[in-house]
Amino acid sequence: MINALKGMKDLLDKDAYYYEKVIKTCEEVAKNYGFTFINTPHLELCTLFKRSVGESSDIVGKEMYEFIDKGENHVCMRPEGTAGVVRAYIEKKLDKNTSVKRWFYHGSMFRYERPQKGRLREFHQFGVESFGNASVYEDASIILMLVEIFSRLDIKFKLLINSLGCLKCMPKYRENLIHFLDSKEGFCEDCLRRKNLNPIRVLDCKNEHCQSLLNDAPLLNQNLCSSCQKDFEILQSVLKENGVDFEVDSKLVRGLDYYSKTAFEFISDEIGAKAAIAGGGRYDRLIEYLDGKSGFGVGFAMGIERIIAILEQKEEKVQREGIYLCAMDEIYIQKLLHIATNLRKEHKVLLSYEARKLAKHLENADKNNAEIFLCMGENEAQNESLFYKNLVKKEEKMIKISDLKKVL
């Protein structure tokens, strides 16, 4: 028997129900914030991610699915969504005008890492990207969008925020941090590698010993220039004004190299201690890194599998929907197919092609979470009627076929 690859799973039944629920909710909120849909390829040139995600990241260093294709191109399956969207923005020359572009996306991402709960090698993300707006109020709106999504999904969270500074204040901080790191011994191999490529990423290390060495490290948000400090204060003010609780985490740097200024992360204890369920921030330098005109960008990505895991723990009852249409004798099935075809213009209809007793049909309708049950037997056929039962309200009656649209 051929099985799915390790760390990759099929999406069906209850998982598919929750996936659709999450995506529908995210899309509705994103559209309310003025975002439109974009879809980028699953396969990109490796150079895109080496230049955007960064050589110091675990993604580029350890986790990319990469290979040489038949055209001798060095390609990889996309490990994250932002770089591809930025590439599309530049390729379509949208970086050359001054208009603001706001996009949302969702789909599969691929990373070769150890599979665990809420973390797969093929996983799904929902994300948004906003280009052309330098205002910190756009950063705040992006965060508030996530707050609204989690509110609609009834997911509890903790919001962590930080400022990573800009090209004006970051070089001095970087210099101070390198001096501090050089004064300490015992960092893990990942930290030593990151120290030479992007020392700020050392702060992101999950190794407990490394974290203990960083207890007295210089803090990012205490080395900000006046402009970055002002923006960070405005961000906190907006969140407070909108009733959003948050915590300033001075060691929050995000997992990718392209962030600057605002950085944020949403964590939840509902699927394990401090599990990240979404994160993002500002990445003004990324557009220029990818040969675009210097500009502004901010966005977030949300892990769908982790959200599904939280929703499944809540054991939410799957909502009934649609119509189950059936017959007690196969001679009526062709007529029901005609009825189903007309109903499907406005309704979800599941038509059974098997003639069964009423009780068996009702059992099957229940298994399929149908809301409305319609059945034709001999009496119904003679009277141009159907047996109707609302499986939510438990109402039942005979209805004329001519009255179907009115009743439904």
From Swiss-Prot:
Catalytic activity of the protein: tRNA(His) + L-histidine + ATP = L-histidyl-tRNA(His) + AMP + diphosphate + H(+)
SUPFAM superfamilies (alphabetical): Class II aaRS ABD-related, Class II aaRS and biotin synthetases
Record's keyword annotation contains Aminoacyl-tRNA synthetase: yes
A GO CC term attached to the entry: cytoplasm
Compartments where located: Cytoplasm
EC number: 6.1.1.21
Keywords: Aminoacyl-tRNA synthetase, ATP-binding, Cytoplasm, Ligase, Nucleotide-binding, Protein biosynthesis
UniProt GO MF annotations: ATP binding; histidine-tRNA ligase activity
CDD domains associated with the record: HisRS-like_core (cd00773)
Family, as annotated: Belongs to the class-II aminoacyl-tRNA synthetase family.
Oligomer status and interactors: Homodimer.
Protein's UniProt name: Histidine--tRNA ligase
UniProt organism field: Campylobacter jejuni subsp. jejuni serotype O:6 (strain 81116 / NCTC 11828)
Lineage: Bacteria, Pseudomonadati, Campylobacterota, Epsilonproteobacteria, Campylobacterales
